[in-house]
From Swiss-Prot:
Residues 1-38, 371-391 are annotated as: Disordered. This is Leucine-rich repeat-containing protein 74B. PROSITE patterns: LRR. LRR repeats lie at residues 106-126, 134-154, 162-182, 190-211, 218-239, 246-259, 274-294, 302-323, 332-354. PANTHER family: LEUCINE RICH REPEAT FAMILY PROTEIN (PTHR24114), LEUCINE-RICH REPEAT-CONTAINING PROTEIN 74B (PTHR24114:SF37).
Length: 391
């Protein structure tokens, strides 16, 4: 079965006959916009004139690329955000869009999620990001941009410090993309937030990204949830966290860090004095990994939120984490999420007692009780709807 990017290539080769429909719609859109713009131009003066020039340029580019214009772009009237998600633009549509985005002085946030950009569309947009000094927030999620498209985007961002937030969820990025991401982390000091969730970054990617995270000097929020980080790659990435002095929010949930990765995270927490929020939900961490993670919690003074729910750490692991926090007089922890973990009464009692010792700490727990325990001790939340928490 062909993917959207392969289908797009075939559609681009169908010839002029297939372009007749879009051409006609483009001309109709241009006539409609021209009629509406005259009165607006009289009211807006030179500001309206600038927008009219850009709109005219966009319409011409749409005709040249045989695509139907996006009406909301023609009527944006200096809006700071352009939301075109789920529009099916494809590479040709983005090429037409690039003509106006390059010199647009208004748009700060660009949302192109789920538009089938593929590599060619990403390359066209990269030229925009290279030249535009206004756009600071970009969402390119679910576009299958691939390694080649990512390389073009990362190269452009390295030359433009204006972009502070980039979302690249669900682009099927694999280990080949890791080297481009590492280069981005090393050379783009203006980037503050990067979302790489729902991709296919694996062990090798973790080994490449770890040193880059250690050297990064700007990123404050990183989302790597729902990837394939495990084994040596997860450990290498965790070690990179030790030297990082900027990252405040890290989401590595739904990976496979396991006990070795949890141990490395624990080591990082012993020396890292910047990280504030950490999500390790569903990472195959057992009792051993939880206890080693706890060693970091015994001395860490900055972590405010730790989510370790849905890991098989059992009661012993939960008790170990709770005792580590209790024994740290300088702990900044405000939320410890150990929900969806089967625990004993000892763990429940310890968690309850800690509310008196550390009133500022919220311990989130949904406890799957053993059948032979009294019904009266069953928590109020039903077993059929366990709590699901994320950063």
């Amino acid at each position: 079965m062909k993917g959207p990017c392969e289908v797009q290539k075939n559609e681009d080769q169908e010839g002029e006959a297939a372009a007749t429909g879009p051409q006609a719609e483009t001309l109709e859109a241009e006539r409609s916009w021209t009629a509406d713009s005259h009165s607006a131009l009289e009211a807006e003066g030179t500001h309206g004139l600038g927008e009219r020039v850009m709109a005219t340029l966009y319409l011409k580019s749409c005709r040249a690329n045989s695509v139907v214009p996006v009406s909301c772009l023609l009527r944006q009237e200096g809006a700071s955000e352009l939301n075109l998600r789920h529009r099916g633009l494809g590479p040709q549509g983005v090429r037409a869009l690039a003509s106006v985005l390059t010199s647009n002085p208004y748009i700060k946030r660009l949302d192109l999620r789920d538009n089938g950009l593929c590599g060619a569309g990403a390359e066209a947009l990269a030229d925009v990001l290279r030249k535009n000094s206004i756009i600071s927030d970009v969402d390119l999620s679910e576009n299958q941009i691939g390694a080649a498209g990512l390389q073009a985007i990362c190269t452009a961002l390295a030359l433009n410090p204006t972009v502070e937030k980039m979302q690249l969820q669900g682009n099927r990025l694999e280990e080949q993309a890791a080297q481009h991401l590492a280069a981005l982390l090393l050379h783009h000091r203006g980037l503050k937030s990067l979302d790489l969730s729902y991709n296919q970054l694996n062990d090798l990617a973790g080994e490449i990204l770890g040193p880059a995270v250690a050297e990064n000097t700007g990123l404050t929020e990183l989302n790597l949830s729902w990837n394939h980080l495990r084994g040596l790659g997860a450990t290498a990435f965790a070690r990179g966290l030790e030297a990082n002095i900027f990252l405040k929010v890290l989401d590595i949930s739904h990976n496979g860090f396991g006990d070795s990765g949890a141990s490395a995270i624990g080591d990082a927490l012993r020396v890292n004095n910047v990280l504030e929020e950490l999500n390790m939900r569903n990472n195959r961490i057992s009792v051993s990994g939880a206890l080693k993670l706890g060693l970091g919690l015994q001395v860490n003074q900055t972590l405010r939120i730790l989510i370790i729910s849905k890991n098989p750490i059992r009661s012993d692991g939960c008790v170990g984490l709770l005792k580590s926090v209790r024994n740290n007089k300088s702990s900044a922890l405000e939320l410890l999420d150990v929900s969806d973990i089967q625990v004993s009464r000892e763990c429940e009692d310890l968690a309850s007692s800690m509310s008196e010792i550390l009133p500022g700490l919220c311990i989130k727990r949904y406890t799957s009780r053993r059948k032979d325990w009294p019904q009266a001790s069953t928590p109020s939340q039903p077993a059929s709807a366990p709590s699901d928490s994320g950063l």
